């Protein structure tokens, strides 16, 4: 299934894509795509519905983040060896974990606000993993059983705040609008191997990132097992799993960063695309 949330910010309704790619309303069956709705049992109930019998959503509504009430938004850094090299950092021996504030979350096609005074706002296309059941101390072999589904994430980052101003990644990753998620939550049954997905990103039509999740340093299963060893993962938690090479700060001979008025387009095979206009923060 391809699940989504649509409507104005803060008033999103749950929906599902039908066989023709049209949005069908799920709000008579679930209040939101959050919590227990993301469990195996909750998703099975949605899967049993015939989308053709659900109300058709007219027009072209705004698409919100594909998960509601996110509890934890967990980032993984330097999880592609070639990205670590372009950043001038060693390949980590353990996952690099940081937090993105949930207030950074926005819809996949909402604008990206360039922070006041920023000259180093950067892009990162990433595979997002949405947890569907509580998990603590799970082993790698069973880790994917706790996944509700997968989505596209743009881990927007302000490099000066992240690296130069005290080296605190949470600061540089957590500005408002720095966490576009979606358009869809694609349930795990439709993603048989999360380690074989092409992902890409363009700015103003120029392709900067072109990678595949097979080159991750730590797989999705390894990340879930690792994270669950130090925290309880809950339904609706989102893990964004790192980015392939081609970020702005790694461009040679000189870095390239986002400015107001640019179009960022990104996507992952089978998970949909995002399109964002950058704008100056007010």
UniProtKB/Swiss-Prot annotation:
The keyword Glycosyltransferase does not apply. SUPFAM superfamilies: FAH. Its EC number is 3.-.-.-. One of its GO terms (molecular function) is ureidoglycolate lyase activity. Mg(2+) binds at residues 124, 126, 155. Its cofactor is Mg(2+). Keywords: Hydrolase, Magnesium, Metal-binding. InterPro entries: FAH, Fumarylacetoacetase-like_C, Fumarylacetoacetase_C_sf. It comes from the Bacteria. GO terms for biological process: urate catabolic process. Belongs to the FAH family. This is Putative hydrolase Bmul_3283/BMULJ_05242. It comes from Burkholderia multivorans (strain ATCC 17616 / 249).
